[in-house]
Amino acid sequence: MASYFDEHNCEPTVPEEQYRQNALLELARSLLSGMDIDLGALDFTEWDQRLPPPAAKKVVESLPKVTVTPEQADAALKCPVCLLEFEEGETVRQLPCEHLFHSSCILPWLGKTNSCPLCRHELPTDSPEYEEYKQEKERRQQKEHRLECLHDAMYT
C-alpha cells in the first residue's frame, strides 16, 4: 500500500514552514466563513528572519559631530568598531544612545543596518515596511503587557 505522500505525489512539510501554512489555512477558513479576522495577528512579513534595513540617510547625515574632550582622551576612550583610542580634539559621530564612533567606522555600519553596534538602539529607516513592522511589534508587546496586568489584577 502506497503512503499518503506517494499517492498524492507530494513531500511532507518541513517544521519551519508548518506555522506559515497553518496561518494561511486559518486565513482561508476565516474568509470562507465570512468571519471578522484580526489581520494584525497574522504576521507574514517575516522580518525576524531578515536583517534590518540601513538607517535613514537623513538621520545618518544629521548625527551630531562631537569633539573629543581632554577628559575623554585621558580616559583612553576607544572607538568600539576599530578599537583605536580617540585623540583630543578629534571629531567623532555620536549616536542617539550617546555612543561615540569614528565617522569612517560608523557610517559604513549604518549603511548596512540601523542599530548601534554596542547597544542595538535602533535608528529610523527609509523602509516603510520595516517601520510598520516595528510599530506592529510594539503594539503586540503593549497588548501582551496589558493582558498580563489584567491577569495579575484578577489574581492578587
UniProtKB/Swiss-Prot annotation:
<dbReference type="GO" id="GO:0061630">
    <property type="term" value="F:ubiquitin protein ligase activity"/>
</dbReference>
<keyword id="KW-0479">Metal-binding</keyword>
<dbReference type="InterPro" id="IPR013083">
    <property type="entry name" value="Znf_RING/FYVE/PHD"/>
</dbReference>
<comment type="function">
    <text>E3 ubiquitin-protein ligase which accepts ubiquitin from an E2 ubiquitin-conjugating enzyme in the form of a thioester and then directly transfers the ubiquitin to targeted substrates. Catalyzes monoubiquitination of 26S proteasome subunit PSMC2/RPT1.</text>
</comment>
<keyword id="KW-0833">Ubl conjugation pathway</keyword>
<dbReference type="Pfam" id="PF13639">
    <property type="entry name" value="zf-RING_2"/>
</dbReference>
<comment type="similarity">
    <text>Belongs to the RNF181 family.</text>
</comment>
<protein>
    <recommendedName>
        <fullName>E3 ubiquitin-protein ligase RNF181</fullName>
        <ecNumber>2.3.2.27</ecNumber>
    </recommendedName>
</protein>
<keyword id="KW-0863">Zinc-finger</keyword>
<dbReference type="GO" id="GO:0016567">
    <property type="term" value="P:protein ubiquitination"/>
</dbReference>
<comment type="pathway">
    <text>Protein modification; protein ubiquitination.</text>
</comment>
<dbReference type="InterPro" id="IPR001841">
    <property type="entry name" value="Znf_RING"/>
</dbReference>
<keyword id="KW-0808">Transferase</keyword>
<feature type="zinc finger region" description="RING-type; atypical">
    <location>
        <begin position="79"/>
        <end position="120"/>
    </location>
</feature>
<dbReference type="GO" id="GO:0008270">
    <property type="term" value="F:zinc ion binding"/>
</dbReference>
<keyword id="KW-0862">Zinc</keyword>
